[in-house]
């Protein structure tokens, strides 16, 4: 499959590896930052955090790269612009990026070796270090749980917002892949055995279940040949069942009452959460994805949103927020935070009455235009990590057996929404997908002091009983295993192991710098500087003013003046109207003074800068503002 994607000024190539059926998607363009990523569909069947632990452990040494932390070694020895790994609710990805060709190959090779040939099969201590292990310092000490992911998730679960988010996912998708925490619940992580951990890797980390993404200017035939010869060609096809369990949720409104944990000594008053949640249904459609993001802003997140003032006037909660999922389930929920725990029905009424009113009376067109404008900028401007973000974007369709190109093309969808803004497209979507949605949860999540402490005590009792069940010899072995793990963790890598980590020589680094296509035009005493580059229709503009005539005594006031610019009424607009017009027609306008020093003469120059962004069809309005 080959298709030009106008929105990205890129040509997409979709390949399937002959032998293993590994899936490869390449975006050919002029981006000097070359991006590679390999991902796997990794649906969890419980909350032991196995997907998260595997992500950590495969980066702890492999067949070729023998140090304990090749990942951190690469951070210090490469020219990478991105190097990370990420666990999602249903997938795990390993993206890297670099401008340097040799560095790109080095990073790609380290990651491919890591995912396909990790040391986890030969060194059990990697699992104990990164996942969890029993720890007993001496015969008189109690047995404890310890481990990198275990401790990380204990920290995550201390945040009430994170707890509530997991409770919502479980409530919306009972019995499904999304009812489990792929990151790991700290009270379930110790249920994971070393054998189950290895089996998870064996099952899912196979080329037949892989999604390989490439972006940028590169010799794609050479790259594909390398991946095939060094890795994919060493495997045979394997039928991998990585199907995502969508669950069997009933189409009904559920009124739920749950609890989350707070500190044992904390007060419970006004710490309840209210949740109004629903799922828009399985979809890889750009329209559904776009509309969900737009609805977030229009309904609650924007200062001018439909419900913001109504929420604040009600006094039911201290704060409100909404959230959308990144998976196929298309979740959308509104949360009221720090309420009295008695007002769920009032909050639901505010939400549904407010949305019904918006549908009947129509949403303010300026709010719609400003929201869509903001969304368009965020969609088009991906920044320096563009390749990684495109990888995540294409998986929104690709992971669910649709074309990766589907999630990247948005021009027609965006145009359709723009053309129909004043014809009720958003109002119709709210009515159909939210108000008339047959599957909703309305939930109160109450604070329970010491809830985690109770679970911790249960674990401590379990560990106490486990210690009592051990013979003297088994206890001595556990103390020795604790000491052995500590020695493994603190032992420095050998010179031989360090030598396996790829490094760049000076000859591998180009001494030149990238040059932009820039033109300078003289207009009287002004210099007009034009830089040409693919910006997806976004015009970035800077206007600089020489402030040499300002007296030295007045310089402290310059920053005050620039802070006030854009925050005051003008000749043509009130402050509120001005900001509204800026939101509708630009990607933001900022004002800032700057002081520059000539490195030769050491003379100073004070300058005022106006920076802003706009779309091609809005330049005149931008300049007017």
Can you say where each PLM-predicted feature lies in the sequence?
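Alpha-helical scaffold elements lining the catalytic groove of polysaccharide deacetylases
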Residues: 192-193, 197
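M16 family metallopeptidases and their MPP-like homologs
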Residues: 32-43, 69-117, 124-135, 162-187, ...
């Amino acid at each position: 499959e080959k298709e030009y994607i106008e929105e990205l000024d890129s040509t997409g190539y979709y390949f399937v590896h002959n032998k293993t059926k590994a899936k490869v998607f390449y975006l050919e363009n002029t981006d000097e930052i070359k991006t590679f990523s390999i991902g796997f569909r990794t649906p969890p069947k419980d909350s032991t955090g196995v997907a998260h632990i595997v992500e950590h452990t495969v980066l702890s040494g492999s067949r070729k790269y023998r140090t304990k932390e090749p990942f951190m070694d690469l951070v210090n020895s490469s020219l990478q612009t991105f190097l990370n790994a990420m666990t999602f609710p249903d997938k795990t990805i390993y993206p890297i990026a670099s401008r340097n060709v040799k560095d790109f190959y080095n990073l790609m090779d380290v990651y491919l070796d890591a995912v396909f040939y990790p040391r986890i099969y030969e060194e059990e201590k990697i699992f104990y270090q990164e996942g969890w292990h029993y720890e007993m310092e001496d015969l008189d000490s109690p047995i404890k749980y310890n481990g990198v992911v275990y401790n990380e998730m204990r920290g995550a679960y201390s945040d009430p917002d994170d707890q509530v988010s997991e409770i919502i996912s479980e409530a919306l998708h009972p019995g499904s892949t999304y009812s489990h925490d792929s990151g790991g619940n700290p009270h379930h992580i110790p249920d994971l055995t070393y054998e189950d951990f290895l089996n998870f890797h064996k099952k899912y980390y196979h080329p037949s279940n892989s999604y390989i993404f490439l972006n940028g200017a590169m010799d794609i035939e050479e790259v594909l040949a390398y991946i095939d010869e060094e890795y994919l060609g060493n495997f045979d096809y394997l039928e991998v069942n990585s199907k995502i369990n969508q669950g069997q949720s009933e189409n009904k409104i559920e009124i739920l009452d749950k609890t989350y944990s707070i500190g044992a000594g904390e007060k419970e008053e006004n710490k309840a959460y209210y949740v109004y949640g629903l799922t828009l249904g399985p979809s890889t459609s750009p329209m559904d994805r776009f509309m969900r993001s737009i609805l977030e802003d229009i309904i609650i997140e924007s200062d001018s949103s439909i419900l913001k003032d109504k929420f604040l006037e009600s006094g039911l909660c201290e704060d409100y927020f909404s959230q959308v999922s990144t998976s196929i389930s298309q979740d959308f929920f509104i949360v009221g935070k720090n309420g009295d725990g008695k007002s769920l029905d009032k909050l639901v009424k505010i939400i549904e009455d407010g949305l019904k009113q918006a549908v009947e009376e129509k949403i303010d067109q300026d709010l719609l235009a400003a929201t869509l404008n903001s969304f368009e900028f965020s969609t088009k401007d991906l920044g320096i990590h563009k390749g990684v973000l495109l990888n995540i974007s294409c998986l929104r369709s690709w992971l669910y057996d649709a074309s990766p190109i589907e999630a990247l093309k948005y021009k027609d969808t965006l145009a359709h929404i723009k053309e129909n803004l004043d014809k009720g497209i958003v109002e119709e979507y709210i009515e159909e997908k939210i108000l008339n949605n047959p599957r909703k949860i309305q939930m109160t999540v109450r604070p329970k002091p010491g809830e985690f402490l109770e679970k911790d005590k249960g674990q401590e009792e379990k560990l106490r009983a486990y210690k009592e069940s051990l013979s003297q010899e088994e206890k001595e072995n556990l103390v020795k295993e604790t000491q052995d793990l500590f020695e493994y963790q603190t032992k420095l890598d050998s010179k031989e192991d360090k030598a396996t980590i790829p490094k760049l020589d000076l000859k591998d680094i180009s001494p030149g710098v990238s040059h932009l296509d820039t033109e300078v035009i003289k207009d009287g005493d002004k210099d007009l500087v034009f830089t040409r580059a693919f910006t997806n229709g976004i015009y970035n503009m800077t206007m600089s003013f020489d402030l040499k005539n300002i007296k030295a005594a007045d310089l402290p006031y310059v920053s005050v003046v620039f802070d006030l610019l854009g925050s005051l009424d003008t000749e043509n607009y009130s402050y509120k109207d001005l900001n509204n017009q800026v939101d509708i027609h630009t990607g933001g306008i900022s004002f800032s003074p700057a002081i520059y020093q000539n490195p030769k003469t050491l003379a100073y120059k004070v300058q005022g800068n106006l920076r802003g962004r706009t779309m091609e069809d809005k330049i005149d309005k931008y300049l007017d503002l």
